[in-house]
């Protein structure tokens, strides 16, 4: 997977000389390892933010969470808030009777935005990138590849993303969706299914065009499903005998063979095959 990751960055930046890439760590990533080769990746116009750096006195290095993005003419057009998944200790401590995690995350985004707003020039937009679960976001009930916290202890209010931010691109939730109905705050979702719970999702990416400090066009681009996903049975698990009959009746596929999820219901030990060997 690491070989594919680095090879992709090399190829896509080599084939697109003005392309810049910004990557932030998610909750499943080794943040320090992801950021370790940063000097080499920067030579390929790729910025990675895995950890929240702090000074010796404990102050957050907000400059490290800021990435300047240039247009084809080489002019800075976007100031990017590149914020990785925030763990305990990454965000400011906020006195609150509510959710300390959510309030701390909100405060980090607020302080970072204040710095960028003072720094931005005319016709420059602010873009935010984050990896978190927003309150009200929709996940698949049986999708165990998405980590949720009981009671919503790590759910962040969409109010953390000010209207001063032209577009907010969020990760963590695999299903594409607007956050609280806001057109410019979205989960693009995963470009491919991450589990069989997502076999009915429409996967893709979001293409955003900026001009004059605003996101002037937001368009969803669907990704083709290269390998189909099938579940047998399509509904709830069934006995081994029923499952075997369904498998026998499956049609011969043309092209890529599907990934198959077989759901077998066993309410007691079951011996299906014996061998004299």
For each of these PLM feature ranges, what is it?
Residues 42, 48, 134-212:
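Conserved beta-sheet core of the metallophosphoesterase superfamily
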Residues 61-77, 187-252:
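Binuclear metal-dependent phosphoesterase catalytic core
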Residues 44-151:
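Conserved catalytic scaffold of divalent metal-dependent phosphoesterases
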Residues 1-63, 158-165, 173:
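Core catalytic region of metal-dependent phosphoesterases/phosphodiesterases
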Residues 244-272:
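Internal helical hairpin/lid segments
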Residues 19, 76, 122-125, 252-260:
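Short coil/turn segments at beta-strand junctions that form active-site/ligand-binding loops
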Residues 273-277:
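Conserved small/polar residues in nucleotide/adenosyl-binding loops
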